[in-house]
Amino acid sequence: MDSTVGDSKSKYDSAYKLFESEDYEAAAEILLTLLEDSFYGAYAYFVLGEISNITGDPLAAKDLYYKALEVKPDLYVNLLSPDHPNYDYVFTGMKYETPVEACPLCGKSGEPIWCYPTMRFKSLHLRNHNPVRVWMYCKDCHHIYAEEFPEQEVLESGTDLAYANMFKTNTSRFDHYSFVLSKLSGFTEGRELLEIGLGGCECVLVAVELGFDVFGVDIMDTGVALAKKYGIEAELQDFMSFETERKWDIIIFGDVIEHVSDPRKSIVKLYDLLKDDGVLWLSTPNFDSAFSVVNGHDDGMRLEVSHKNYFSRISLLDLLEQCGFVPVDYQLSPYFPGSMEVIAVKDVRGND
């Protein structure tokens, strides 16, 4: 082995050990000496990006992550295991994404809070996204949102492969949805149920068994096809464009709101689709959850590029109340660590 290469490897290994022990200043000092190295330079830029993100400079992290990919476009071949879905990713340049100019909840300006190289995420990655995600924080709403996002038509061109595993029925969730539907029945006697975002159809299947009149809406043809396979009526539609005079007793909105551009309009739409004595159940990741606080920078949801929003308990409950709902129940998700499940009823009950 060339002595120069061996020296570079020794330096990088030493720097990485310091990084792992959270001695970021000492690690950075060594990494800066490796930036011109023909092999380790790219990895030095990458780890410096990690350090910048962890120490509170997400915009510097963004520049460093991209510099690493520019120096070595196939960087991940030495960062990920061969069985990782993005092991063979090769950076070909930044794609245009639509800037999110302000907080989608209140319209005020946010500040960069995190930056992550998203190719490390193992599930639901869409390669139409840029490989680096900056998250913005709104202190007024205590809400986090994506700095930029691809156009919808670009997203749709990559969804079938990316979401394939999502549209498989997970029978282990049947018991939980039975519990949820029984709880919802305590807030309404009605039996008409609408689910928006069908996923693996676990909820609607259980609802049918329990005697509910079920209808589904999904933007993904895979979800609609699965519902129809099970004999469940469903429509392929962006629910924001879903027009009907029908009202429902129960609406299930599981893990959808983090994907929408305008959460406020979505909640208003749900309010309009519910009967006056109707009840809403929704779930979404919570960046303030006990799980997320403990995991910090290892929180996988920070890598989830298909999400436009990352709610907190405060931002979600405030939004519901501002749109005419009264939150009546809050639970931790038993299936998605760090996610919350909320039940809300229409505020008209308090005005009778």
Please tell me what each predicted stretch does.
Residues 98, 253, 260-352:
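S-adenosyl-L-methionine-dependent methyltransferase catalytic module, highlighting the catalytic core
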